Curated annotation (Swiss-Prot):
Gene Ontology cellular component list: plasma membrane; proton-transporting ATP synthase complex
Family, as annotated: Belongs to the ATPase epsilon chain family.
UniProt function note: Produces ATP from ADP in the presence of a proton gradient across the membrane.
Name of this chain's protein: ATP synthase epsilon chain 1
Lineage: Bacteria, Pseudomonadati, Thermodesulfobacteriota, Desulfuromonadia, Desulfuromonadales
Gene: atpC1
Keywords noted in UniProt: ATP synthesis, Cell inner membrane, Cell membrane, CF(1), Hydrogen ion transport, Ion transport, Membrane, Transport
Residue ranges crossing the lipid bilayer per the database entry: none
Subcellular location, principal: membrane
Topology of the protein relative to the lipid bilayer: Peripheral membrane protein
HAMAP family: ATP_synth_epsil_bac
SUPFAM superfamilies linked: Epsilon subunit of F1F0-ATP synthase N-terminal domain
Complexes and interactors: F-type ATPases have 2 components, CF(1) - the catalytic core - and CF(0) - the membrane proton channel. CF(1) has five subunits: alpha(3), beta(3), gamma(1), delta(1), epsilon(1). CF(0) has three main subunits: a, b and c.
Gene Ontology molecular function: ATP binding; proton-transporting ATP synthase activity, rotational mechanism
Compartments, as annotated in UniProt: Cell inner membrane
């Protein structure tokens, strides 16, 4: 059994990271899940949420937006729409997006076409704020 996982994360715009890591935690569509070296092969979907990985005693966080995770032979491939490290999140902009989404949701009902889009925007903003607020590694 390998001691490390090879983690690769890709968005349509760029390769976000390639790292040798000790473990990951991801926001699966059916709930949060973790992967350690020697994990059973897996293909699953991700939802908007906080993705983290550990290297030694350091933990790194990213805000991710919908995608897929494939685990095979101590390799974890993550394909997501967007991924932002905590260092790249503009906290003021995320808070402004949260305020806009909250205000717009107060004006809408679940029957409105825009309602679910605004709920998704609210969730993305909340995750970005959470990740940015981590205040550095680990």
């Amino acid at each position: 059994m390998a001691q490390k996982l090879k983690l690769e994360m890709v968005t349509p715009a760029a390769q976000v990271l390639i790292e040798e890591v000790d473990e990951i935690a991801a926001p699966g569509s059916l709930g949060q899940f973790g992967v350690l070296p020697g994990h059973t092969p897996l293909l699953t979907t991700l939802q908007v949420g906080e993705f983290s990985y550990r290297k030694g005693s350091d933990v790194y966080y990213l805000a991710v937006n919908w995608g897929y995770v494939e685990v095979a032979e101590d390799r974890v491939l993550v394909l997501v729409e967007t991924a932002e490290t905590q260092d790249h999140i503009d906290l003021a902009r995320a808070k402004a997006a949260l305020g806009r989404a909250e205000a717009r949701l107060r004006e809408l009902t679940p029957a409105d076409k825009e309602y679910h889009n605004m709920q998704a925007a609210l969730q993305r903003a909340m995750v970005r704020i959470q990740v940015a607020g981590r205040g550095g590694r680990g």
